Amino acid sequence: MAKKIQGFLKLQIPAGAANPSPPVGPALGQRGVNIMEFCKAFNEKTKDKAGYRIPVVLTIYTDKSFTFELKQPPMTELIKKISGVKKGSDNPLKNKVGKLSKAQIMEIVDMKIKDLNTDDREVAAKIVAGSARSIGIETEL
């Protein structure tokens, strides 16, 4: 018989750095999930993605067990890391803080395509370019 789902929980946690302190501990504790078990499993699966915040979707079952699915880092984090920018522009229409080439955009598309709502790489490239422009980074598209 399949386990009965109690609920879902979405978190963004730095890769390899999950610990019982807030926000992870309280979010899991109030649902009765073994916090240390989750932290160890999450840190093990994300140790190779250090430097990124990783979105995770936890499925919590009525017997207090859980499974989790890792997503790709947020698009703006990938854009900033690949373009070498530390922070987005405070006024993206006037102040440009960096530039992305078509090759860099396609690199981001390759990482994010499974999390986007399209399978077409050209459409995905436009989504990435739009996100880049929204934080003040020029694009070659």
Curated annotation (Swiss-Prot):
GO biological process: one example: translation
InterPro entries: Ribosomal_uL11, Ribosomal_uL11_bac-typ, Ribosomal_uL11_C, Ribosomal_uL11_C_sf, Ribosomal_uL11_N, Ribosomal_uL11_N_sf
The keyword Ligase appears for this protein: no
Modifications made to the protein after synthesis: One or more lysine residues are methylated.
Complex formation: Part of the ribosomal stalk of the 50S ribosomal subunit. Interacts with L10 and the large rRNA to form the base of the stalk. L10 forms an elongated spine to which L12 dimers bind in a sequential fashion forming a multimeric L10(L12)X complex.
HAMAP family named among the record's database cross-references: Ribosomal_uL11
The family this protein is said to belong to: Belongs to the universal ribosomal protein uL11 family.
Function according to Swiss-Prot or TrEMBL: Forms part of the ribosomal stalk which helps the ribosome interact with GTP-bound translation factors.
Record-given protein name: Large ribosomal subunit protein uL11
Lineage start: Bacteria, Pseudomonadati, Campylobacterota, Epsilonproteobacteria, Campylobacterales
Gene: rplK
